[in-house]
Amino acid sequence: TAFAELDRNLSDDEREEWNAIYASFSSRSLLRNTVIGLESIPIPTDDEPEQVLTCMVVMRYLVKVLIPLPLFWIEPTGINPNSVIGADVDYIIIGVDREGECAIAARSLALEQQRWHALNVQHIAEGDVVSASVMACGPTRITVTACGFDVTMGQQAMSYTYLADMREEYHAGQQLQAKVLSVGEDMLALSVRDVGT
């Protein structure tokens, strides 16, 4: 078959990458990589003008993984997609184009899986300290991902000292510890400044 021929010429790193992609596609296992850019994919339609789908691009080695923006967030955030470049994201593969050497993924499915696990297995509660990964940072607000939730916080949740511009301290991809202030089925409130208290 054509795929067997394609797979025969793979290096060990390439084979490992494809095996991880196939495993995620077949068993819904999570993969994690860094957002390296944005790509606009034309969608053929009968209407004029042509429709375009914007995707986040992640790549571990050679295979381009596209995460369409509608499948990136569970709830709309209004965050500029460019500010997410550099963030580490979890995702689940939902489509594979072996010959085109690319795959389609959904971060939203990974978030739902992580959220369910945090609420029903870990039973996160007020006062717990959890890992949080910075998704995007602006001058006065920061969005982190923790336990399957995207949480946006102002400066008062980050530090007891005033920060004129939070981008001087925080950046996409940075790993933080955060204290759970409250948690529910559809919400998580965090504080980075209160981790030690």
Each language-model region and where it sits:
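Single-stranded RNA-binding regions, centering on S1/OB-family and related RNA-binding modules
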Residues: T1-T197
